[in-house]
């Protein structure tokens, strides 16, 4: 989002205040779980997945826009689904390659897997989102860009953590706590910037995009 805003001024064309508040509050909840309990367990997973279900229900019932519906024949619909499935398959293969090679880099460089995950793996798995966002901007589809960014954060924090914690407890080692808290604070600060820009300006300026980029660069610097 910061990189895209630095290139183009992004206008908030839809009401995303509730969405931003939702993800910020749940991100803060995860941060509290890590700080006080050093774990995200089965109980937390149920809360996260229940929140995801409620959000999905809200999304369907209150964010639907019949004006955006277009007439499409069945062939074009099938073609679109096939392209999406093939793209997801390619992403799955690419993600596995990123993880495997990132682990090799961590061993060769003597860098912790946690820091490699926060940097190389996170950047690699975010590239599809970046390209999707840039394509959305070129087409003037700012709503798609905002939905992509907010939706990916919601899936990563709420759905992925929720499902993972149902399978096994996600424990945070004491030596990782400082990094975990730092990342949580960076996350909340970034979303607060988005919230303030939406409330006061209904847009994300190039200057705000630059601030987000500086925060990310500072984050990477602190990791290494």
Question: Can you say where each PLM-predicted feature lies in the sequence?
Answer:
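Hydrophobic alpha-helical segments, chiefly the membrane-spanning helices
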Residues: 1-224
């Amino acid at each position: 989002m910061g990189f895209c805003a630095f290139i183009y001024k992004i206008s908030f064309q839809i009401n995303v205040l509730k969405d931003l508040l939702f993800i910020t509050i749940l991100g803060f909840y995860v941060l509290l779980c890590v700080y006080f309990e050093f774990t995200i367990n089965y109980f937390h997973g149920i809360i996260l997945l229940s929140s995801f279900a409620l959000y999905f229900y809200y999304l369907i019932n209150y964010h639907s826009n019949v004006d955006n519906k277009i007439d499409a024949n069945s062939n074009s619909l099938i073609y679109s689904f096939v392209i999406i499935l093939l793209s997801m398959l390619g992403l799955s293969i690419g993600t596995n390659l990123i993880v495997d090679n990132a682990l090799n880099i961590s061993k060769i460089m003597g860098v912790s897997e946690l820091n490699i995950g926060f940097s190389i793996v996170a950047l690699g798995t975010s590239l599809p989102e970046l390209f999707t966002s840039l394509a959305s901007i070129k087409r003037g589809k700012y709503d798609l860009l905002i939905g992509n960014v907010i939706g990916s954060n919601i899936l990563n924090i709420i759905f992925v953590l929720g499902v993972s914690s149902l399978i096994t407890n996600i424990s945070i080692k004491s030596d990782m706590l400082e990094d975990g808290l730092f990342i949580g604070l960076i996350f909340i600060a970034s979303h607060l910037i988005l919230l303030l820009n939406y409330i006061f300006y209904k847009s994300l300026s190039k200057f705000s995009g630059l601030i987000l980029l500086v925060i990310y660069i500072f984050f990477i610097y602190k990791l290494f």
